[in-house]
């Protein structure tokens, strides 16, 4: 039995969230009656309203009146008035991943998981399948620039989804093709131990049916170890590793992107194939690896080399992934979602490869618990930055932790050898600080999962307003 067409209204609590909004949009496009609520107005809320979805700002028990089902994310607390009202009225309550799983049952699915790179890789798989006339349905964790949204309903038989591992519910997703980009210690508030994280990813891959396959990056030692433990599923490995089935070769920076080729090796058939002259309009080894995963899926699903080549060269990127927000006196301003040390290091390395000038990082640490648990890693991931400007921690609903704040982070960076670390008093001070440091040819990279994205978009205008 599949999701009945007559069910509805489907009420989303926190409908403006990036994961929730995509599912709501696809359900609406399928003809279901969708409604919801969110704590505040946002671009996602406005976009969904334009599609005719009724959205309340604020959470109230009355909002769920008439709903057939309530969809909640793990961010919704047990005492939320809408959740309490739904349970009191015996309205079924489902998690975001469960509703996503219901949508996935309608199609053949590619699900992209990993600690980092999910959103970009999901966008790349979607772009390649789109170019191959698959017309896929897509539900992503970020705004795909080519669509102007994070979701679209396609008429084809395939769906491409980002699989969020943060609360373990990605194990509910019925994927025919699974991608694992990497596995690092993250979301330990849910998993408790890194061993539990690894077990979850192993289960994610082993959930793939016997007729499907998984694409896994063996440049990452934890993923390589997982590959060795999975015996009864078809695995296509990728990476720069000489043992990879889809091997990234001859990676070179090229303008604001990179060029490379991918060599395929079919161990069972004993054959080899190479796709040369690939160009990706995004810098960084991490993005080339993400592209290699997408290329491996596209190649396996029968796309021609030329289609892959053209689609990759035309890839428009994802909002908040090395996004240029403007420039000032020859200084380029970049906005990036990177908030984990591995992501930050990769983004700064990409910036270093993209300019002959200096790299100035502006970081807004995201969550006190993350800064605490990965403090040493945070103090060593800025090596490709000439200067680091440190803002206050974005709490994301967390209570402060004594000794885990901006000033201690500044001291930690300095203790690890960083020569120019600047504490930022507030966002209004940013333009003045940047103007005093940056010169023509420099890249200013704003990093974080909080509201620093708003600073990044405002910064070019604020710098111009200062004159000079």
From Swiss-Prot:
User: Which pathway does the record list?
Assistant: Cell wall biogenesis; peptidoglycan biosynthesis
> Gene of origin?
murC
Q: Which domain of life is it from?
A: Bacteria
Q: Per its UniProt record, what SUPFAM superfamilies does this chain match?
A: MurCD N-terminal domain (SSF51984), MurD-like peptide ligases, catalytic domain (SSF53623), MurD-like peptide ligases, peptide-binding domain (SSF53244)
For this protein, the Enzyme Commission number is: 6.3.2.8
User: What InterPro entries does this protein's entry cite?
Assistant: Mur-like_cat_sf (IPR036565), Mur_ligase_C (IPR004101), Mur_ligase_C_dom_sf (IPR036615), Mur_ligase_cen (IPR013221), Mur_ligase_N (IPR000713), MurCDEF_pg_biosynth (IPR050061), UDP-N-AcMur_Ala_ligase_MurC (IPR005758)
- Gene3D superfamilies, alphabetized: Mur ligase, C-terminal domain, Mur-like, catalytic domain, NAD(P)-binding Rossmann-like Domain
The catalysed reaction is: UDP-N-acetyl-alpha-D-muramate + L-alanine + ATP = UDP-N-acetyl-alpha-D-muramoyl-L-alanine + ADP + phosphate + H(+)
- Which keywords belong to this entry? ATP-binding, Cell cycle, Cell division, Cell shape, Cell wall biogenesis/degradation, Cytoplasm, Ligase, Nucleotide-binding, Peptidoglycan synthesis
Q: What broad class of enzyme is this?
A: ligase
Provide the primary localization: cytoplasm
> What role is this protein assigned?
Cell wall formation.
List the Gene Ontology MF annotations in alphabetical order: ATP binding; UDP-N-acetylmuramate-L-alanine ligase activity
Biological process according to GO: cell division; cell wall organization; peptidoglycan biosynthetic process; regulation of cell shape
Location comes to: Cytoplasm
UniProt protein name: UDP-N-acetylmuramate--L-alanine ligase
Work out whether the entry's keyword set contains Nucleotide-binding. Answer: yes
Which residues bind ATP per the record?
114-120
Q: Per the record, GO CC terms?
A: cytoplasm
């Amino acid at each position: 039995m599949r999701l009945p067409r007559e069910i509805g209204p489907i009420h989303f609590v926190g409908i403006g969230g990036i994961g929730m909004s995509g599912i709501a949009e696809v359900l609406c496009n399928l003809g279901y009656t969708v409604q919801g609520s969110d704590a505040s107005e946002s671009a996602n809320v406005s976009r969904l309203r334009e599609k005719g979805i009724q959205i309340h700002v604020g959470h109230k028990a009355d909002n769920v009146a008439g709903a057939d089902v309530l969809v909640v994310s793990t961010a919704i607390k047990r005492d939320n008035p809408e959740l309490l009202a739904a349970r009191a009225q015996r309205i079924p309550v489902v998690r975001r991943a469960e509703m996503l799983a219901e949508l996935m049952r309608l199609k053949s699915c590619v699900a992209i998981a990993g600690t980092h790179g999910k959103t970009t890789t999901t966008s790349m798989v979607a772009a390649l399948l789109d170019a191959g006339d698959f017309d896929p349905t897509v539900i992503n964790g970020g705004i795909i620039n080519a669509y102007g949204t994070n979701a679209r309903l396609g008429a084809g038989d395939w769906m491409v989804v980002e699989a969020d591992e943060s609360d373990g519910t990605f194990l509910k997703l019925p994927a025919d093709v699974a991608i694992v980009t990497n596995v690092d210690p993250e979301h330990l508030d849910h998993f408790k131990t890194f061993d539990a994280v690894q077990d979850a990813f192993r289960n994610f891959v082993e959930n793939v049916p016997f007729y499907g396959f998984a694409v896994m990056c063996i440049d990452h030692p934890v993923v390589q170890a997982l590959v060795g433990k999975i015996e009864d599923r078809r695995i296509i490995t990728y990476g720069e590793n000489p043992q990879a089935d889809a091997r990234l070769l001859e990676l070179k920076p090229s303008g604001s992107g990179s060029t490379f080729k991918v060599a395929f090796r079919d161990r069972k058939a004993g054959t080899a194939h190479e796709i040369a002259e690939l160009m990706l309009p995004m810098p960084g080894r991490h993005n080339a690896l993400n592209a290699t995963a997408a290329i491996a899926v596209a190649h396996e699903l029968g796309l021609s080399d030329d289609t892959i080549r053209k689609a990759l060269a035309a890839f428009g990127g994802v909002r908040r992934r090395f996004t240029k927000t403007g420039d000032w006196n020859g200084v380029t301003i970049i906005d990036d979602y990177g908030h984990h040390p591995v992501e930050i290091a990769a983004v700064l390395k990409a910036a270093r490869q993209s300019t002959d000038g200096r790299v100035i990082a502006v970081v807004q640490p995201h969550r006190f618990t993350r800064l605490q648990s990965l403090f040493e890693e945070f103090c060593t991931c800025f090596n490709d930055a000439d200067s680091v400007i440190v803002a206050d921690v974005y709490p994301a609903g967390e209570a402060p932790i004594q000794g885990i704040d901006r000033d201690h982070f500044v001291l930690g960076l300095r203790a690890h050898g960083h020569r120019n670390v600047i504490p930022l008093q507030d966002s209004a001070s940013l333009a003045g600080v940047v103007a005093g440091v940056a010169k023509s040819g420099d890249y200013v990279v704003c990093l974080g999962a909080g509201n620093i994205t708003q600073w990044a978009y405002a910064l070019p205008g604020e710098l111009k307003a200062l004159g000079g």
